[in-house]
UniProtKB/Swiss-Prot annotation:
NCBIfam families: cyt_tran_rel, nicotinate (nicotinamide) nucleotide adenylyltransferase, PRK00071.1-3. This is Probable nicotinate-nucleotide adenylyltransferase. The lineage of its organism: Bacteria, Pseudomonadati, Spirochaetota, Spirochaetia, Spirochaetales. PANTHER family: NICOTINATE-NUCLEOTIDE ADENYLYLTRANSFERASE-RELATED, PHOSPHOPANTETHEINE ADENYLYLTRANSFERASE. Its EC number is 2.7.7.18. GO terms for biological process: NAD biosynthetic process. It comes from Borreliella afzelii (strain PKo). The gene is nadD.
Length: 193
């Protein structure tokens, strides 16, 4: 089986994440896509007011009608700081005989050599680089596959900022995720009294 791994904070998951997963499924003939929400990523802050449960609930809602997309909570279970090499080790234990593809955006790939044990990552999975902010392909000494995906210019941080400032986001999120955010009052500015 050909399995793609997409790690991220998913704070919140948005249509860009789902669109990229569909592109990967098509372009690489993927059988299964695993979304792995990070517990405490090394390269960004999660932010206040949004729990791990909230992020997983939103992912479940976003993926509920996708028969090839699943959630793996190995980083959540392990807790603490999340390193990609540890995530891959966890996934490889579950999928010993499958071909694994780790998908990262070019924004992260540009600093891939500074990650914990990048050579082991690149040698233990097929490293797939997706366009996120750069139209040109970045060069690297690490073995990788570049996919020519379409860039959807949205980010979770932009969505959080739009919600906090009262701007519409309905076209950026799966409906169930939007409803969950509204029902749970997530990402709104807290007013001090």
């Amino acid at each position: 089986m050909r399995i793609a791994i997409l790690g991220g904070t998913y704070n919140p998951v948005h249509i860009g994440h789902i669109f990229l997963a569909k592109e990967i499924e098509y372009l690489l003939n993927i059988d299964k896509i695993i979304f792995i929400p990070t517990c405490n990523p090394t390269h960004k802050l999660i932010g206040e007011g949004v729990s791990v449960k909230n992020r997983i609930d939103m992912l479940k809602l976003a993926l509920k009608n996708e028969n090839k997309m699943f959630i793996d909570d190995c980083d959540i279970i392990n807790g603490g700081i999340t390193y990609t090499i540890d995530t891959i080790s966890c996934v490889k234990k579950k999928y010993k005989n499958d071909k694994l593809f780790l998908v990262i955006g070019d924004d992260l790939f540009q600093n891939f050599d500074s990650w914990k044990d990048p050579q082991s990552i690149a040698s233990s999975v097929d490293l797939v680089v997706a366009h996120r902010i750069y139209k040109e392909r970045l060069k690297s000494s690490f073995k990788h596959i570049y996919i020519d995906n379409k860039i959807i210019p949205i980010s979770s941080s932009e969505i959080r900022n739009r919600i906090a400032n009262g701007f519409p986001v309905s076209y950026l999120l799966p409906f169930g995720v939007l409803k969950y955010i509204k029902d749970n009052n997530l990402y709104v500015k807290k007013v001090n009294v």
